[in-house]
Amino acid sequence: MAVILSLIKRITTIIIALALFSSCGKNTKESNSNEQKLSTNTETENSKTKKKVLFVLTSHEDLGDTGMKTGFWIEEFAAPYYLLKDKGIEITLASPKGGQPPIDPKSASPDFQTPATVRFNDDKETQEVLSRTIRLETANQADFDAVFYPGGHGVVWDLAEDENSIALIEDFYNNNKPVAAVCHAPAIFKNTKNTDGTSLVNGKKVTGFTNGEEEAVQLTSVVPFLVEEMLKSNGGIYTKKADWSPYAVEDGLLITGQNPASSEPVAELL
C-alpha cells in the first residue's frame, strides 16, 4: 500500500511539473510573439515618419550648338544628397527620361572637386542608384515631403519646359510642400503658375545663377535664357551675392540657391 501511495505521489509530481513547463513555454512563445509584433509596429511607424525627398535631375546633355556636352553639376547633386541622407532622409531620384542622367564633364574636373564630390566618386552604391533614376512622369508628390532640383546647364533646356516637371512643382506647392532648386535649376520656375495664373515666383524672394556668372563661363549667348533675367521678368524679388559666393534664399515653400557653392546651404534650409 505504501509503495502504491509513493508511486501516486511521484506521478502527481511529474504531471504538475509537466503542466508548469508547458505553461512557461506558452508564455515564452507569447512573449516572443508580442516582442515581434512590437518590433514590426515600430518599424512600420518609423517608415511612416521617415521624411522622403524627391530629387529631379536633367536628362539634357547637349550644350546648345557648341558640340560640347552638359548635364547636371555633380556638386549640386552630391552635397545635398549626402547632407540629407546622413540625416536619415529617404531620397528618390528622377529624371525626364529615367535611367542615367548626364553629368556635366566640367563638374568632374579636379578644379571643381569638393568633399561631397570626392565621396560620390568613391560611392559605387550611390552611382548605381543614380544610373536607375525613375521616369519623372511616374513621380507623385503624395509619396514625398519635398522636391529638390540640382542644377547644371541641362536644366534650362529640358526641365524648364517639361510639362511633367511643371505639373509636379505646382502640385508640391499647392499641397504645402517645399520646392528647392540651386544654380541653374531655378529655371524650373519659368512656366510654373499659381492657381490664379500668376507666376509661382511672383512676389517671392528668389535667387539663381547670375548674369555675371553666366558671362564668366562664356555661355550667355548659348543658353536659351538667363536664369536671373527670367526670375525677374516673372515677378520674382531677385537678390544675389558676389559671383560664386554661397547664397540661399527661403521664401515660404520656395528655396533657391545662387550657384554650386550654394548647394549645401539650400539643403540645410530644406
Regions found by a protein language model. Give the residues of each.
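Bacterial N-terminal signal peptides that target proteins for export
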Residues: M1-T12
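Bacterial N-terminal signal peptides
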Residues: I11-F21
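Extended, subdomain-level signal for the structured scaffold at the beginning of enzyme domains
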Residues: G25-N175, A187-L270
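Residue-level detector of intrinsically disordered, flexible termini
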Residues: M1, I16-L18, D145
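Conserved, well-structured core segments that form or line functional sites
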Residues: N176-A180
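Catalytic nucleophile serine of serine hydrolases
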Residues: C183
